[in-house]
């Protein structure tokens, strides 16, 4: 990621706005990556390119040439969780783990799209499919709605949170939603189910709990 920045023309003092072609899907992951690298001046375009086009706003097919990036990343380790951190948290129950995958994949009743992965979820984790925090037009729900979604899932917001999904992409949608409600004690399990489900040493739960 940092290697790509070197020819991007992005500077540390730039205010960044990231977007994707699906509304809110991969852009929160990019937002999180910039945060992880210590670039705080980054926001997500709500609704992405589809909403921008629907509103009749200007678009172009030209890309501005980039300049050499000057600077270095300052990794914000509190924003990322690795396998060991999640493994310990399952035993000690000192984090809330939230899974952004679909209900069927979480319960282990739908096959995983990646071959060789077990079905189910991390024991003790809760399920909030990422689309639940989005409106029909793929914009982020308002703060009150998001808070109610997390409360309905019995998430204890007094604990630090770890988000997870299939590969670490849509989990970032939940991180973005948490930031919208002013809750900042959250990290993202980068390996997500692609790592957890592929490790035979990792415990797996099936069903709704």
What are these regions (language model features)?
Residues 1-15, 128-161:
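Helix-loop module immediately N-terminal to the HCX5R catalytic loop
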Residues 1-89, 170-187, 191-192:
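Thiolate-centered catalytic microenvironments shared by cysteine-dependent enzyme domains
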Residues 17, 96-98, 162:
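Conserved beta-strand elements of the Class I
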Residues 49-122, 200-209:
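Active-site neighborhoods of enzymes that stabilize oxyanions during catalysis
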Residues 126-135, 193-194, 198-199:
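Short, flexible loop segments at boundaries between secondary-structure elements
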Residues 165:
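Short cysteine clusters
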Residues 184-209:
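Cysteine-dependent PTP/DSP-like catalytic domain, specifically the C-terminal lobe
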């Amino acid at each position: 990621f940092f290697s790509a920045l070197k020819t991007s023309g992005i500077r540390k003092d730039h205010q960044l706005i990231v977007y994707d072609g699906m509304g809110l899907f991969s852009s929160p992951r990019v937002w999180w990556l910039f945060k992880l690298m210590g670039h705080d001046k980054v926001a997500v375009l709500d609704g992405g390119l589809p909403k921008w086009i629907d509103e009749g706003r200007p678009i172009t097919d030209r890309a501005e040439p980039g300049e050499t990036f000057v600077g270095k990343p300052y990794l914000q380790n509190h924003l990322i969780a690795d396998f060991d951190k999640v493994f310990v948290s399952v035993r000690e129950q000192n984090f809330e783990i939230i899974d952004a995958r679909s209900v069927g994949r979480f319960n282990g009743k739908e096959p995983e799209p990646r071959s060789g992965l077990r079905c189910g979820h991390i024991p003790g984790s809760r399920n909030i499919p990422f689309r639940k925090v989005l409106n029909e037009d793929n914009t982020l729900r308002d703060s009150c709605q998001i808070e109610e979604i997390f409360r309905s899932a019995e998430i204890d917001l007094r604990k630090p949170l770890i988000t997870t999904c299939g590969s670490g992409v849509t989990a970032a949608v939940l991180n973005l939603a948490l930031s919208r409600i002013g809750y900042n004690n959250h990290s993202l399990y980068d390996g997500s189910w692609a790592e957890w489900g592929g490790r035979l040493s990792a415990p797996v739960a099936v069903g709704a709990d």
